[in-house]
């Protein structure tokens, strides 16, 4: 069975529309940087006027180009459709870094067809670069003012020498009494840990700077763009249980340069059998 994908013409149109949206969202997001007013969602996570304004801009561009497509965004909701076309929007992935004035945040846009990611962009406004991918077309890095170039994950490495990106330890070992994911055990098993965080670390996996990246807490609007970019760069993705099916509906993500490394990471973070429910 043929898996869904965009045609070359559809991809060109999609890139033109999404890149036009990024010009507007970049300007808004960067205009608020270092003078952010923070509000808190019911789950305790930060949200800013830039988050909401940027998502409104993204929605406007998607609706103008594809008025009949389904749409789900972090700030204004929607429905995750498993049939037909569905856009996933995260206006600022890494708001915790953004509110501190740190440049390690990004805008995520992805397109699902029949529940599968077929297109995704990781836009890093402060770094002025975009990692983008479409099924069957590979993964590319485009720096503002330059030309897009294909990128690939690093050569396969064993876990003991791997370079691993992580957002935080707090979501696992320091929360909920040490579970469910044992990131401290993973840190001891791997070669080098860098607390890069959020979408930036997955962009670095795509170009072979990091060997792997993980996040224990994820949403569909996070996973869609990150997964297709890593896959098209030649990497391997799953949730932390090792599951691939319906990945955008999972609650965690691990991306690695090879299936062997990804499976080793999943084993390292999993609780002992005696602690599993």
Where are these regions (language model features)?
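Oxyanion/phosphate-interacting regions
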Residues: 1-16, 20, 181-188, 202-277
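N-terminal subdomain of lithium-sensitive/metallo-dependent phosphomonoesterases centered on the IMPase/IPPase/PAP
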Residues: 1-92, 274-277
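Residue-level signal for inorganic ion chemistry
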Residues: 25, 29, 51, 62, ...
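Conserved beta-strand segments of alpha/beta enzyme cores
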Residues: 37, 70, 191-192, 236
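Conserved beta-strand termini and adjacent loop/short-helix elements that scaffold enzyme active sites
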Residues: 41, 74, 196-198, 240
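Active-site-adjacent structural elements in enzyme catalytic cores
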Residues: 64, 72, 80-145, 228-231
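Short, Asp-centered acidic motifs that coordinate Mg2+ and/or phosphate
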Residues: 70, 119, 163, 211-212
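Acidic beta-strand-loop-alpha-helix segment within the catalytic core
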Residues: 110-202, 250-277
């Amino acid at each position: 069975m043929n898996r869904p994908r965009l045609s070359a013409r559809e991809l060109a149109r999609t890139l033109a529309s999404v890149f036009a949206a990024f010009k507007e969202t970049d300007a808004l997001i960067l205009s608020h940087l270092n003078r952010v007013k923070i509000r808190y969602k019911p789950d305790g996570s930060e949200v800013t006027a830039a988050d909401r304004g940027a998502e409104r801009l993204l929605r406007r561009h998607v609706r103008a180009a594809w008025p009949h497509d389904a749409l789900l965004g972090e700030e204004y909701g929607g429905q995750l459709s498993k049939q037909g076309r569905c856009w996933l929007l995260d206006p600022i992935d890494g708001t915790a870094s953004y509110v501190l004035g740190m440049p390690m945040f990004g805008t995520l846009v992805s397109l699902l067809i029949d529940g599968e990611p077929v297109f995704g962009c990781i836009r890093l406004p402060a770094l002025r670069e975009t990692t983008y991918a479409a099924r069957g077309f590979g993964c590319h890095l485009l720096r503002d003012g330059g030309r897009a170039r294909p990128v690939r994950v690093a050569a396969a490495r064993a876990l003991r020498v791997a370079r691993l990106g992580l957002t935080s330890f707090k979501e696992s070992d320091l929360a909920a009494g040490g579970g469910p994911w044992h990131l401290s055990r993973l840190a001891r098993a791997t070669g080098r840990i860098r607390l890069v965080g959020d979408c930036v670390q997955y962009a670095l996996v795509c170009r072979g700077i990091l060997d792997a990246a993980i996040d224990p807490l994820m949403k569909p609007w996070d996973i869609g763009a990150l997964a297709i970019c890593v896959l098209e760069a030649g990497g391997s993705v799953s949730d932390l249980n090792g599951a691939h099916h319906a990945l955008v509906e999972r609650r965690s993500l691990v991306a690695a340069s090879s299936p062997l490394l990804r499976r080793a990471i999943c084993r390292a973070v999993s609780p002992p059998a005696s602690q599993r429910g």
